[in-house]
Swiss-Prot record:
Annotated metabolic or biological route of this protein: Siderophore biosynthesis
TM spans (from-to): none
One GO BP: siderophore biosynthetic process
Enzyme's top EC category: oxidoreductase
Keywords of this entry: Iron, NADP, Oxidoreductase
Amino-acid positions noted as binding substrate in the UniProt annotation, renumbered to this chain: H112
Gene that produces this protein: DMAS1
Name of the protein in question: Deoxymugineic acid synthase 1
InterPro entries, sorted: AKR, AKR4A/B, Aldo/ket_reductase_CS, NADP_OxRdtase_dom, NADP_OxRdtase_dom_sf
Length: 314
């Protein structure tokens, strides 16, 4: 059982993120094993992260050593990268993912971005010539085939606006179960949350702490004076206050830390709650999206502005 429960769609409420800079298989493998011991059951990866193989190794060892009874006790999520967001490349991409993971299926397979690149473009920097128009219908039909074949128990999307979800739902035979997007106290996603609830789509938060330390991240979440004051008054860390806030919205969340102490802290958000006054203070924090997808916007590409990429929703 997951230490933190599951959403109605079956997605564990708290997952371990594994997007790391550079090839680091040993730390990822060790961190996943320790996370399983601590109670994590959801592990979030992607073809673009290059961490699928160590997650698969850790999962196999966890089953072999009895940390979990079987593969079915774990929930593994991966994502198809933009270079494989083509009708004829989605299924082969998932088969490679499964080979990396040494698994017969993933629990959730998602479209990483509503973006298509030329085949083979996996590493930045990207040029305008690398981008092609995103054929949402073709890509989603390929995702549905992955589900029908039993290779993905569920399918979803990442970084989709309300407008893009509306378009997808207009033709999808199998609707997306999850939309994984940036959510934190500095980017609260009220409109998107309301839309997804109405449509039965589970939100899952990435960068719930603001992705401090990444090339695109920000200190604005962890350095928030409001969050520091609330944390001090409750005897919690700022990270715990952020994660608890996301948790109270009904969202699932992905949090990345390979430090054992912080991994434990990040699970300790379930048996306490924020007061109404604290929620109100957080609701008034000025809003600013941190991960704007800058590298996918180009005057010569399909998305010529942030307005086009996010449909005016940032």
């Amino acid at each position: 059982m997951s230490a933190t429960g599951r959403a109605p769609c079956g997605l564990p409420r708290i997952g371990l993120g594994t997007a790391v800079q550079g090839p680091r298989p040993d730390p990822v493998r060790a961190a996943v094993l320790r996370a399983i011991q601590l109670g994590y059951r959801h592990f979030d990866t992607a073809a673009h992260y290059a961490t699928e193989a160590p997650i698969g190794e850790a999962a196999a060892e966890a089953v072999r050593t009895g940390l979990v009874a079987s593969r079915e006790d774990l929930f593994v999520t991966s994502k198809v990268w933009c270079a494989d967001a083509h009708r004829d490349r989605v299924l082969p991409a998932l088969r490679r993912t499964l080979s990396n993971l040494q698994m017969e299926y993933v629990d959730l397979y998602m479209v990483h971005w509503p973006v298509t690149m030329k085949a083979g473009r996996f590493t930045a920097p990207f040029t305008p010539e690398d981008f092609e128009p995103f054929d949402m219908r073709a890509v989603w039909e390929a995702m549905e085939e992955c589900h029908r074949l039993g290779l993905a128990k569920a399918i979803g999307v990442c970084n989709f606006s309300c407008k893009k979800l509306e378009t997808l739902l207009s033709f999808a035979t199998i609707p997306p179960v999850v939309n994984q997007v940036e959510i934190n106290p500095v980017w609260q996603q009220r409109k998107l949350r309301e839309f997804c609830r109405a449509k039965g789509i589970q939100l899952c938060a990435y960068s719930p702490l603001g992705a401090k330390g990444t090339h695109w991240g920000s200190d604005s979440v962890m350095d928030s004076g409001v969050l520091h004051e609330i944390a001090k008054s409750k005897g919690k860390t700022v990270a715990q206050v952020c994660l608890r806030w996301v948790y109270e919205q009904g969202d699932c969340l992905i949090v990345k830390s390979f430090d054992e102490g912080r991994m434990k802290e990040n699970l300790d958000i379930v048996d306490w709650e924020l007061s109404e006054e604290e929620r109100q203070r957080i609701s008034k924090i000025p809003q600013r999206k941190i991960n704007q997808g800058r590298r996918y916007v180009s005057e010569h590409g399909p998305y010529k502005s942030f307005e086009e990429l996010w449909d005016g929703e940032i």
